Amino acid sequence: MKNLGLFCLLLSCIGITSCKNNQSEKVEEAAEIEVEQAMDVSCYRAIYEQDTVDIKMNTDKNGEISGDMVMKVMDMPIKDGEIVGEYRGDTLFVSYTFVQGGYTKKTYKNPMAFLKKGDQLILGNGKIETTMGATYFVKDSPIDFEKVKYKFSKVDCDTK
C-alpha cells in the first residue's frame, strides 16, 4: 500500500512538471506569433498650435491595424490609449480606447477616421452618435477631411 502511494505521488509530480514546461512553450509560441503578425510598424505625428498627437501603428498581414495613440491637447488632460481598425479604400476607420489624465478607472471609446494621402494621415470630423454606450459615426453623414486640425506626417518611430 505504501508503494502504491509513492507511485501515485511520483506520477503526479511528473504530470505537474510536464504541464508547466508545456505552458512556458505556449507563452514563447504566442510571443513569436505576435511578432510575426506585425508586418509593418509606422509612426505619425500631428502638431496643431500647442497640441501634439502621436500614433504608433502596427499593420498585420491581414491589413488590420492596431497601435497606440497619445493626444496632448492644450489645457486638457492627456489622452493615452489604443487604436484598432482597418482601411476601407483610402480611409482608415479605428476605434480609439483611451484613459484621460492617467485616471485609469474610467475608459473612453471613440470612433475616428483618417484619410491617407501619400505619407500623410488626415483626421476627419464627422457626426457621431451614442446608442447603449456604443459611439459610432452617423450613417450616411459625410466625414469632413478638409476643415481639420490634425494632419499627421510620417515620422521615424525612434524620434517619437
Predicted feature descriptions by range:
Residues 1-6:
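Positively charged n-region of N-terminal signal peptides that target proteins for export
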Residues 15-18:
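C-terminal motif of bacterial Sec signal peptides marking the signal peptidase cleavage site
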Residues 20-38:
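Short, low-complexity, disordered segments immediately C-terminal to signal peptides
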Residues 34-51:
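Tryptophan-anchored aromatic micro-motifs
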Residues 46-64:
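Short, solvent-exposed loop/hinge segments that bridge or flank secondary-structure elements
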Residues 49, 64-68, 92-160:
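Beta-sheet ligand-binding and adhesion/scaffold domains
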Residues 54-56, 82-84, 111-113:
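Short, surface-exposed charged micro-motifs
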Residues 58-86:
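N-terminal glycine/threonine-rich, aromatic-flanked beta-hairpin/loop signature
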